[in-house]
């Protein structure tokens, strides 16, 4: 197994599919990385040379991935909450942010039902 951005990448899968194991790299970004490094998308990771793997690592290094991306997302949410804007308040209360109804639905964001105590 090859390691890219601190993640074990499966050797027996195509390059595009294997790159999606890295948090922050989807199919489109993986295709762009393959095109930039000159590697065919259907090439298996196990057959790549060390120079090609270094090229992929360098290209992935240009993107925000894994821990840095998670930290950036959390900091953006924290910033919204500190500002006290509408989206920040919705985050703070654990409710949907984008205008969905909450009278009957939104169970995913709100969590399980709480019984009414009498």
Curated annotation (Swiss-Prot):
Disordered: annotated span: 94-118
Coiled-coil stretches: none
Native organism: Cellvibrio japonicus (strain Ueda107)
Entry keyword annotation includes RNA-binding: yes
Record keywords: Ribonucleoprotein, Ribosomal protein, RNA-binding, rRNA-binding, tRNA-binding
One Pfam family per UniProt: Ribosomal_S13
UniProt record similarity statement: Belongs to the universal ribosomal protein uS13 family.
Signal sequence, start to end: none
Molecular function, one GO term: rRNA binding
Subunit structure: Part of the 30S ribosomal subunit. Forms a loose heterodimer with protein S19. Forms two bridges to the 50S subunit in the 70S ribosome.
InterPro entries documented for this protein: Rbsml_uS13_C, Ribosomal_uS13, Ribosomal_uS13-like_H2TH, Ribosomal_uS13_bac-type, Ribosomal_uS13_CS
GO biological process: translation
The protein's name: Small ribosomal subunit protein uS13
Function: Located at the top of the head of the 30S subunit, it contacts several helices of the 16S rRNA. In the 70S ribosome it contacts the 23S rRNA (bridge B1a) and protein L5 of the 50S subunit (bridge B1b), connecting the 2 subunits; these bridges are implicated in subunit movement. Contacts the tRNAs in the A and P-sites.
A cellular component term, taken from the record's GO annotations: cytosol
SUPFAM superfamilies membership: S13-like H2TH domain
């Amino acid at each position: 197994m090859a390691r890219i951005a601190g993640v074990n990448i499966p050797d027996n899968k195509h390059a595009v599919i294997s790159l999606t194991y890295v948090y922050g790299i989807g199919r489109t970004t993986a295709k762009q990385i393959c095109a930039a490094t000159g590697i065919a998308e259907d090439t298996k990771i196990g057959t790549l040379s060390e120079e090609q793997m270094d090229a992929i690592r360098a290209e992935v290094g240009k993107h925000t991935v894994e821990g840095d991306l998670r930290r950036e997302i959390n900091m953006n949410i924290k910033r919204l909450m500190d500002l006290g804007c509408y989206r920040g308040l919705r985050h703070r209360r654990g409710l949907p942010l984008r205008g969905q109804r909450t009278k009957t639905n939104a169970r995913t964001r709100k969590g399980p039902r709480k019984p009414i105590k009498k």
